[in-house]
Amino acid sequence: NKTHAYVGGGATVTANANRENVNFVDGTTTSNVNSNYKNLNDKDTKKDYVSSKSNESAQSGVLVGAKSSQKIRSWVVSGAASGAVSVVGSVNVLTFGSETKAWIGKNATVTSNHSGDILVIAVDTTSIQDVVGNVSASGAVSAGISNDTITFQKVTNAYVDEGAVLTSGRNIIIKAISDEAYVVVVVSAGAAVGATPTGAINGAVSTIVIENETTAEVKANTAATILTANGSIAIWAEDNQDLYVIAG
């Protein structure tokens, strides 16, 4: 899943900032998955020359914004019963990648006159609720296993490229925000009626691999990049994670 918003290299953008508020153009990409599945690979791509809504209070000016939001719900549950031997398993594999970038290209000139802002903002929010479980019962031997694997990669980047010249009558803000909330429950339960204490064997395994890259930057490796503002210049990156895992 890729969401890009940018001003191309060498472009010239001027906002007179004669109005009180900016009229945002929404370039939001949203992915929703609500189903039982064993494997998810999301490779959709979207590139736009757009502006996007964000949680910013701004005067009229120039906004280059990219926003991506993913809500993933997964339920994988199995069960089995037998008078003799009962074996059951649940396996879930989730692989997901998201790239959200907002930038002003090389040698671009962006001017926001009067009391206008220049905003370059990338925001990516992710919510995952994942439940994997099994229940088995038998009169002799009962065995069950639940295995859940999540691999998630995110790149959230807001930047001004080399050689660009930004002039703002108010503030210049370059901001990258990434938020993640994961709730993972992996449960395996079994019973062997009348069997020995070793007659019921159950296991639950949860593996989570998260690779996040959240950056906000002004590049100037080979050419000078000039930012001038009558107000403030802010460059920051923020990554917030809430992870709850229950396995047993």
PLM region spans:
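Low-complexity, glycine- and small/polar-enriched segments
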Residues: 1-248
